[in-house]
Amino acid sequence: MNKAIIKEFQQIPGVGKIIANDFWNIGLRSVSDLKDKSPEDLYWKLCQYQHAHVDRCMLYVFRCAVYYASNETHDPELLKWWNWKD
């Protein structure tokens, strides 16, 4: 695992070390890897990796992270993962 990449992921609002490691574990290697990805697909990939149901809040984090990676300018309210609930 590359510490620099983990630090890069932690630049995303709401992403700490554990979630950054989750990103790594499902094959993401940079913030740009999140660009235009399906948050739902990433969430299910994490569930498969962990062989368990993952808390739905993680889906909201994926939505926020994909938004962050896919846009150059950001609405501050959309950088809060809880604003990405269903």
Predicted features along the sequence, with ranges:
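C-terminal extensions
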Residues: M1-P13, K17-D86
